[in-house]
């Protein structure tokens, strides 16, 4: 099958990142100074405050009043930043009926248990993972009451806004995180951390003195935890509209999902280190089996290079096993990557994050070293995007 041709700005940026340092030094100094200025507009306390704001709505489970209130709050925040074209995507969600095998109508499914979701191979110590469904495991009575109303099938909404480009408004990058959660906690990390990151990027890029050649759409997905339903609905409803005024051509999709916790592999007894490991990093993933694997891999390395130049604390690594997040519905239509605290399949899926889908996924669980890992992911994405869309300050 013929591979798609990469967009011109993408090719130019990849080439630019390969130019030796002496040649880069001859570049226009104003543009060379631009990205550090934008990165400096990200702030740890602002990022933390946005995560904290999201946790006011508990786990934000899809199909609940608390989820709808969170969508309203996110929209109000985006409008306060001055982000353009604030809109909502509407879709209907009807969960599959339970099957006798307990797989929501999917029946019995077998797979190689030595291989992780996404294609990686488990290594080292593995700890048990799962979704907490027991309300009594949440000791905070206030939060337990907030998270009690169940999900109801029906119409869903997710909010997005767009930074409209000045010269190529008909082309855009999609930047996402999912705002819904599960587990009887506050969904602070999964995925308050990614949602807050995307909102902070929207704030920085929406400043009146920031201009971009190409557009950026910031999307806060709903229904990720039920099967990527919100992002699937977006692809189904809007893929064919590309090139129109309301849906610029997709140049790439960048997802952010669980950004805070990289304390290392579980110990033999299943416990983990209490503090962020010194060698913590931002995982940048693409899917090697996708139709746009080559382009997605190159996009991932663009983000890796941006991290090397502009992130303040933690490095990045690139992997080929992107899975189980809202970039997946896009991966066969456009270069798609995701940024995470750890590789989703082989590490998070092996118990590297004990708060994943648990009552302990609370704002209070994390400290500044954890929040700073999320901020470094924000710095990475902001720096890479600024180059990809031709950002300027004037």
Pin down the residues of each PLM region.
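Alpha-helical metal-binding/catalytic segments enriched in His/Glu/Asp
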Residues: 159-161, 175-228, 381
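Metal-dependent peptidase/peptidase-like ectodomains
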Residues: 221-326, 332-336, 343
């Amino acid at each position: 099958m013929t591979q798609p041709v990469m967009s011109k700005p993408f090719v130019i940026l990849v080439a630019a990142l390969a130019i030796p340092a002496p040649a880069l030094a001859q570049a226009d100094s104003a543009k060379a100074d631009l990205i550090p200025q934008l990165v400096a507009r990200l702030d740890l306390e602002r990022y933390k405050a946005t995560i904290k704001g999201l946790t006011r709505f508990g786990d934000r489970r899809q199909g609940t009043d608390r989820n709808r209130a969170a969508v309203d709050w996110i929209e109000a925040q985006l409008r306060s930043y001055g982000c353009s074209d604030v809109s909502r995507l509407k879709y209907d969600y009807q969960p599959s009926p339970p099957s006798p095998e307990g797989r929501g109508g999917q029946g019995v499914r077998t797979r190689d248990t030595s291989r992780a979701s996404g294609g990686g191979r488990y290594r080292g110590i593995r700890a048990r993972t799962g979704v907490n469904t027991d309300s009594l495991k949440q000791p905070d009575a206030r939060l337990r009451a907030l998270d009690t109303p169940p999900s109801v099938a029906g119409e869903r909404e997710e909010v997005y806004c767009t930074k409209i480009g000045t010269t190529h408004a008909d082309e855009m990058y999609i930047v996402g995180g999912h705002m819904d959660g599960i587990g009887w906690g506050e969904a602070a990390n999964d995925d308050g951390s990614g949602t807050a990151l995307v909102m902070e990027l929207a704030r920085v890029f929406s400043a009146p003195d920031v201009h971009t050649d190409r557009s950026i759409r910031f999307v806060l997905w709903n229904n990720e935890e039920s099967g990527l339903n919100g992002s699937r609905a977006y692809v189904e409803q809007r893929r064919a509209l590309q090139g129109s005024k309301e849906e610029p051509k997709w140049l790439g999709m960048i997802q952010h999902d669980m950004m805070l916790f990289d304390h290392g592999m579980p110990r033999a007894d299943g416990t983990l280190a209490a503090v962020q490991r010194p060698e913590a990093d931002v995982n940048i993933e693409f899917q090697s089996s996708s139709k746009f694997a080559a382009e997605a891999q190159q996009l991932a390395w663009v983000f890796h290079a941006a991290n090397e130049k502009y992130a303040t604390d933690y490095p990045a690594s690139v992997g080929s096993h992107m899975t189980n997040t809202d970039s997946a519905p896009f991966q066969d239509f456009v270069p798609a990557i995701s940024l995470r605290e750890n590789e989703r399949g082989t590490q998070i899926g092996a118990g590297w994050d004990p708060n994943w889908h648990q009552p302990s996924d609370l704002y209070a669980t994390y400290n500044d070293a954890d929040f700073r890992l999320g901020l470094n992911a924000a710095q990475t994405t902001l720096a890479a995007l600024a180059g990809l869309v031709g950002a300027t300050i004037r």
